[in-house]
Amino acid sequence: MSTPHINANVGDFAETVLMPGDPLRAKYIAENFLDDAKQVTSVRNMLGFTGTYKGKPVSIMGSGMGIPSMSLYARELIVTFGVKNLIRIGTCGGIGSDVKIRDVIFAQGACTDSNVNRARVRGTDFAAIADFDLLLNGVNAAKDLGIKAKVGNVFTTDTFYQADDTFYKDLDKLGVLAVDMETAGLYGVAAEYGAKAMALFTVSDHVITGEATPADERQSTFNEMVKIALESI
């Protein structure tokens, strides 16, 4: 049975789905990391694939940009297709003073300027956090691969272009490591519908210092993050 946004059949998705924002990255991962990968959905060019990694079934599907896009795909994957584990993989902007471009970051929790999680619990702040087991498996996979990673709080925003850049300095004082646009929504959906979720990123640029990863170097650091995610399942 398909949904308005996913034209797959029940059983087409593995219990674990990796979710990059860009559907073309989903295609890249399927073609370069999975065995026997097949495309299972393509509505609005939001591509999804299922294959195996070291014999384990795994799916890859794009999430699009922002909490609304991530939330509708995550909900449909969980409710209609029986997905149990959702792992966001993507880039982020560094905030922390000790965060460098190319760093790998695990989002232990995600604060946000969106009201989406408040709406879930009648205006009450909801602590959007990663599933502990997925997080632990990810951190251990990074260690086994010899990849240093940071673990901590991130900030999920609805506004890509902030009017006041000093805002990020306030977040740095609170120990927030990085900014993205999806994680708080993903964690909220997973909590609401009884699934597990975790997000990890590579730092593509730093929103305070202005430092950025050259475009030709981004793929190699992205590959490291994908490897961590796949080894963690």
UniProtKB/Swiss-Prot annotation:
UniProt site positions, description: Important for catalytic activity: 218
Which Gene3D superfamilies does the entry mention? Nucleoside phosphorylase domain
Q: Name one Pfam family in it.
A: PNP_UDP_1
* Annotated phosphate binding sites: 21, 25, 44, 88-91
Q: Which GO terms describe its biological process?
A: purine nucleoside catabolic process
Q: Which residues form the active site?
A: 205
Recite the UniProt keywords alphabetically. Glycosyltransferase, Transferase
Coiled-coil ranges from the UniProt annotation: none
A cellular component annotation (GO) from this entry: cytosol
Q: Which reaction does it catalyse?
A: a purine D-ribonucleoside + phosphate = a purine nucleobase + alpha-D-ribose 1-phosphate; a purine 2'-deoxy-D-ribonucleoside + phosphate = a purine nucleobase + 2-deoxy-alpha-D-ribose 1-phosphate
EC number from the UniProt entry:
2.4.2.1
Residues involved in a purine D-ribonucleoside binding: 5, 180-182, 204-205
The Gene Ontology terms for molecular function here are: purine-nucleoside phosphorylase activity
State the similarity comment: Belongs to the PNP/UDP phosphorylase family.
Write out the function statement from the record. Catalyzes the reversible phosphorolytic breakdown of the N-glycosidic bond in the beta-(deoxy)ribonucleoside molecules, with the formation of the corresponding free purine bases and pentose-1-phosphate.
What is said about its interaction partners and assembly?
Homohexamer; trimer of homodimers.
User: HAMAP family from the entry?
Assistant: Pur_nucleosid_phosp
Record's protein name: Purine nucleoside phosphorylase DeoD-type
Organism listed in the record: Pseudoalteromonas translucida (strain TAC 125)
